[in-house]
Amino acid sequence: MSNISTDLQDVEKIIVLDYGSQYNQLISRRIRDIGVFSELKSHKISAAEVREVNPVGIILSGGPNSVYEDGSFDIDPEIFELGIPILGICYGMQLLTHKLGGKVVPAGDAGNREYGQSTLTHTPSALFESTPDEQTVLMSHGDAVTEIPADFVRTGTSADCPYAAIENPDKHIYGIQFHPEVRHSVYGNDILRNFALNICKAKGDWSMDNFIDMQIKKIRETVGDKRVLLGLSGGVDSSVVGVLLQKAIGDQLICIFVDHGLLRKGEADQVMDMLGGKFGLNIVKADAAKRFLDKLAGVSDPEQKRKIIGNEFVYVFDDEASKLKDVKFLAQGTLYTDVIESGTDTAQTIKSHHNVGGLPEDMQFELIEPLNTLYKDEVRALGTELGMPDHIVWRQPFPGPGLAIRVMGEITEEKLETVRESDAILREEIAKAGLDRDIWQYFTVNTGVRSVGVMGDGRTYDYTIAIRAITSIDGMTADFAKIPWEVLQKISVRIVNEVDHVNRIVYDITSKPPATVEWE
């Protein structure tokens, strides 16, 4: 199985070297917001590999390590000699200081450990251009710079950090001890914009329009006269991929809609009517519900569920593809966040992603992932640019394994039906309350827990349904949605009264992190 993804070699970009910060994806996202493409790269990247990538700038992210400890994340020192502008953030500043001859010590030893918002005072610098001399920033460091390298100057201080910003403007190397990527740093976006546009001299012309042109060209070059299969779920990601591919290769695209019996209420009909009818996509419907549910019988481990569904999904494709000629490629709606969350050099894999870790090694297709460099909100912007209507572009995210990962424990028809019906009620009431565009994602989960209840004159022992609703910008971090109590109450009353085998509703008030969006 080979993987053909977006070719960004010729795109002006700033790379972010990943040192394990919880915020490193936000750095990339903020740079893109400025109009410059940005992506994460391993901190193990060599200077020669950086030359091949040819970025206009490099950002060294924060991280949990201490530069003076054995085994801490390092950098190829030749990168500092490439002449490419560099910005070190937090650990990144400490690392460049350490490698270039300065001194870093535990902040407790220097008496200047800082966590939380602080006031930065800076002197004139291209990095701080058009920002106030005093500004609020977020500090989060247990170590501190006590001596700066030769030819560097101090440009920023705080009450507890004598070297909050340093630079060598002749070599275009900058370091800041705070985190400009988080919103707690009030002028953080301005600082990143100064680095990207003024110091790196980026044009700032990255846009979805450019992305469409680039991807269409790349898809046509890759596919040639062969045919492409797309697994169409009806969700935002696969729908956008479908419209993009059709724009690129027309009738060479064959969409296979696999009804695996794990869809939301009425979803199968919506997919066929909306994408097959309105947009004219060539859709083959595979009714495979019994096949999937038979394979999932007795399985309760979430990772095993994902693997089974991933394997069966592709095997269904194999069955359908065997009926077709000249099919060489399989398209997927994998996003950048999917790739990141499935593990990097600096982080453990939290859970295999359904678009990354569930594919069998003997798959007969080459893989095309046109969206795997985009965040979720960028995919929505891409859909709008492609002329797709809001009710598709702003549709709720839905995982590839479907309701299988919204049913805790073993999957049964009874459990699936409780989730289908309760989810339909939730979506209906959220829309009635005018909250459907304010809440990033919302759904129900059958927790697998039964509890005692009283309905009418009788005792019940039925399922507990959890409501999960979050607000987010890009899916990397999220907070639980503050749904008005009267709306929650109405949802709860309707579910208990209208959905069989349910007698209790709970609301998930956990943010991401520590929790993930989905329960499995």
Curated annotation (Swiss-Prot):
Its EC number is 6.3.5.2. Pathway: Purine metabolism; GMP biosynthesis; GMP from XMP (L-Gln route): step 1/1. Residues 13-205 form the Glutamine amidotransferase type-1 domain. SUPFAM superfamilies: Adenine nucleotide alpha hydrolases-like (SSF52402), Class I glutamine amidotransferase-like (SSF52317). ATP binds at residues 233-239. It catalyses: XMP + L-glutamine + ATP + H2O = GMP + L-glutamate + AMP + diphosphate + 2 H(+). The keyword Plastid does not apply. GO terms for molecular function: ATP binding; GMP synthase activity. Residues 206-395 form the GMPS ATP-PPase domain. Keywords: ATP-binding, Glutamine amidotransferase, GMP biosynthesis, Ligase, Nucleotide-binding, Purine biosynthesis. The active site is at residues 90, 179, 181. InterPro entries: Class_I_gatase-like, GATASE, GMP_synth_C, GMP_synth_GATase, GMP_synthase, GMPS_ATP_PPase_dom, NAD/GMP_synthase, Rossmann-like_a/b/a_fold. GO terms for cellular component: cytosol. It holds the Pfam family NAD_synthase. It comes from the Bacteria. The keyword Transmembrane helix does not apply. HAMAP family: GMP_synthase. Catalyzes the synthesis of GMP from XMP. Homodimer. NCBIfam families: guaA_Cterm, guaA_Nterm, PRK00074.1. This is GMP synthase [glutamine-hydrolyzing]. The gene is guaA.
